[in-house]
Amino acid sequence: MLTHQTAARTSQPDYWQIDDPPSKRMIMKEALHLFAQKGIEGVTVREIGARAGYTNAALFKFFATKDALALDLFERCYLALFESLSAAARPELPFADRLHGIVTVFVRQMERDPDALLFVQDQLRSMWPRVSPGIRRHSILGLIRATLKQGVRENRVRSTANLNLLIASISGTLQQFARMLSFGEFRGRATAWSGELEQIILRIVSPAQLEINASKSFRRGELQ
């Protein structure tokens, strides 16, 4: 077994578990980085082993296949993200605080572990049908929906708005920001944009802004 050369993070990744041996942790860390950068299909077991500093046999000791490794990583990263969002957007908080918590967790995760966030974002469609029932019970979109429903009750979100469209708008805004940030389209730290992201989302969902936009569209003859 080769000695890995990768420096440890200043903070432990959320997807590491207490009983994971060091070799498994390093394999997962380097596999995640490669998957986030190149996609699962674009990565070979040999590449993962080379980056982690371990032989292919070490990977197969823990995972039957590369796809099994990818699925395990996805479930761990997704659940860690959900738990962070859930803790920051607790049901007893008012709508504004819950939305603030969601945006804050998202941008902090982009700084703390962008590979994990981008991997979950990019692989959600293909991985979600394959995850365990326990993971499926923890829906990030469901958490956003619950937050929006509270906003409706507090008159912070328009009651006649289609929640699915609002969920798509919020998740799409955050996901595209993450991708553009990773491409260098935004300068500075992710958290520097947190306040503006939150204000954009509030404008999307607020009753007053929706009514203004609808009125303008009607005057332009855009509504049927």
List the predicted regions and their residue ranges.
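N-terminal intrinsically disordered/low-complexity leader segments
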Residues: M1-P22, E211-Q224
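Helix-turn-helix
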Residues: L2, M26, L34-A68, D72
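Generic hydrophobic, amphipathic alpha-helix propensity
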Residues: S23-A31, I48, L73-C77, L81, ...
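Amphipathic, non-transmembrane alpha-helical scaffold segments
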Residues: M28, A70, F74, Y78, ...
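Hydrophobic alpha-helical connector segments
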Residues: D72, S86-R112, L163-I170, K216-F218
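Short secondary-structure transition hinges
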Residues: V107-A146, L165
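Hydrophobic/aromatic-rich alpha-helical bundle segments in the mid-to-C-terminal region
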Residues: L117-D122, R130, V152-I200, A208-Q224
